[in-house]
């Protein structure tokens, strides 16, 4: 269990803020799809004196002396990442998923080259070419999206767009897409136009590690990911690639995109990767998907419309247009009753990104607490009451949320 007694002695204001946040995590139902609860071992690794060490370069090829032990740490993380995903090469130094993506662009593209990435409004990510992101400012970006009738990726239209625009890189991956990605189809399209296939599996990395979602590694030239979310490690990034691209990727990360790696974070990555190699982790990932399907089914039974009519992974998008409430309003009301989620645009949304017509829900964090499919039915009922009868049901909802959180204690 984490300990902040020393912080309390030195900085009571900071200690109070930390305790407030930990209590928030304990006492609210966490449904943000990109969040999770790491193990005590990961927290311990993050707080080690490894944070003191500069280690520019890579194991065995550092620019500083005294790196013989942090070399062991980083090599453990590298070897475990390769083992988990069956990858030929792994770079565990990216500070975030976005920086991992930026490093890949830096490795393969020149300013003005074309990226084909998923439209942010259809479930993509800022770092896949959004105009407000560096990826959308330095490169020409052509978006692809989902079909209007079923909200599945339109692979025929994707192929047509790729042939018309000849992208240097095709990015497969999303931040709000509830269905399985067809990596074989992406590979075929990339080959037809001579593009590098980059897969951003940040959201589904844990599912992939456990074999619950098809792996992109056999199909992609490069795979990026965060190490948190479903993978349940520390906040950070990672790049997997074919051996032929190893030198190019490593150079793009350091010195191309970053300086010294965060060795305490890499240690925490190594710990989480060891956890990901266990049978318990596989069961956990299976339960994430079971819980997501149970929550989605229960919500639809309550009259909620789900984008694509369900989910294959850990997340779902609720279309609130038939509920007379915006995503922003729903997020606020749910937070008032201690249920945390995020407003989210839906495909072909008529609301602004700051208002939205939907909310995104995910099950990694509640599954980490030990919640099961029956609990998902309870959560669905709580969400329904919050949206449909907030004023009359508020006190009852808060009481039921408290009971559920007490049943599954966190960081005690």
From Swiss-Prot:
Primary role: Catalyzes the reversible interconversion of serine and glycine with tetrahydrofolate (THF) serving as the one-carbon carrier. This reaction serves as the major source of one-carbon groups required for the biosynthesis of purines, thymidylate, methionine, and other important biomolecules. Also exhibits THF-independent aldolase activity toward beta-hydroxyamino acids, producing glycine and aldehydes, via a retro-aldol mechanism.
Reaction it catalyzes: (6R)-5,10-methylene-5,6,7,8-tetrahydrofolate + glycine + H2O = (6S)-5,6,7,8-tetrahydrofolate + L-serine
Protein name: Serine hydroxymethyltransferase
Quaternary structure note: Homodimer.
GO molecular function: glycine hydroxymethyltransferase activity; pyridoxal phosphate binding
Coiled coil stretches, renumbered: none
Source lineage: Bacteria, Bacillati, Bacillota, Clostridia, Eubacteriales
Entry-linked Gene3D superfamilies: Aspartate Aminotransferase, domain 1 (3.90.1150.10), Type I PLP-dependent aspartate aminotransferase-like (Major domain) (3.40.640.10)
HAMAP family: SHMT
Modified residues (N6-(pyridoxal phosphate)lysine): 229
Predominant location: cytoplasm
Xref: CDD domains: SHMT (cd00378)
GO biological process: glycine biosynthetic process from serine; tetrahydrofolate interconversion
UniProt gene name: glyA
Site (Plays an important role in substrate specificity): 228
EC number: 2.1.2.1
GO cellular component: cytosol
Species: Ruminiclostridium cellulolyticum (strain ATCC 35319 / DSM 5812 / JCM 6584 / H10) (Clostridium cellulolyticum)
Pfam families in the cross-refs: SHMT
UniProt KW keywords: Amino-acid biosynthesis, Cytoplasm, One-carbon metabolism, Pyridoxal phosphate, Transferase
């Amino acid at each position: 269990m984490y300990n902040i007694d020393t912080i309390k002695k030195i900085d009571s204001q900071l200690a109070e803020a930390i305790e407030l946040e930990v209590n928030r995590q304990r006492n609210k139902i966490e449904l943000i799809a990109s969040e999770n609860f790491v193990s005590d071992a990961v927290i311990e690794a993050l707080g080690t004196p490894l944070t003191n060490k500069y280690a520019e370069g890579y194991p065995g090829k550092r620019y500083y002396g005294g790196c013989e032990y942090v070399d062991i740490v980083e090599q453990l993380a590298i070897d475990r990442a390769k083992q988990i995903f069956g990858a030929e090469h792994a770079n565990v130094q990216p500070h975030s998923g976005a920086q991992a993506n930026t490093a890949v662009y830096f490795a393969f593209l020149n300013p003005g080259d074309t990226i084909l990435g998923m439209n942010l409004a259809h479930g993509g990510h800022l770092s896949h070419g959004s105009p407000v992101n560096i990826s959308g400012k330095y490169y020409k970006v052509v978006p692809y999206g989902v079909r209007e009738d079923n909200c599945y990726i339109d692979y025929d239209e994707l192929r047509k767009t790729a042939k018309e625009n000849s992208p240097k890189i095709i990015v497969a991956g999303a931040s709000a897409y509830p269905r399985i990605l067809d990596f074989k189809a992406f590979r075929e399209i990339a080959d037809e136009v001579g593009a590098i296939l980059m897969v951003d599996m940040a959201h589904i990395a844990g599912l992939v590690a456990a074999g619950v979602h098809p792996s992109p590694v056999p199909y992609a030239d490069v795979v990026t990911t965060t190490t948190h979310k479903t993978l349940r490690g520390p906040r950070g990034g990672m790049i997997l690639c074919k051996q032929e691209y190893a030198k190019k990727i490593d150079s793009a990360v350091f010195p191309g995109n970053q300086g010294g790696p965060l060795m305490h974070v890499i240690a925490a990555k190594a710990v989480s990767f060891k956890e990901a190699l266990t049978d318990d982790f596989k069961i956990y990932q299976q339960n994430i998907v079971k819980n997501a399907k149970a929550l989605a089914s229960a919500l639809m039974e309550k009259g909620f419309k789900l984008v694509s009519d369900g989910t294959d992974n850990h997340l779902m998008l609720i279309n609130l247009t038939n509920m007379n409430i915006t995503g922003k309003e729903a997020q606020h009301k749910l937070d008032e009753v201690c249920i945390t989620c995020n407003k989210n645009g839906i495909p072909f949304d008529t609301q602004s990104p700051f208002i939205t017509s939907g909310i995104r829900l995910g099950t990694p964090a509640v599954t980490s607490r030990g919640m099961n499919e029956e609990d998902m039915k309870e959560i669905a009922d709580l969400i329904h009451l919050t949206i449909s009868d907030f004023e009359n049901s508020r006190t009852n909802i808060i009481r039921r949320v408290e009971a559920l959180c007490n049943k599954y204690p966190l960081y005690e």
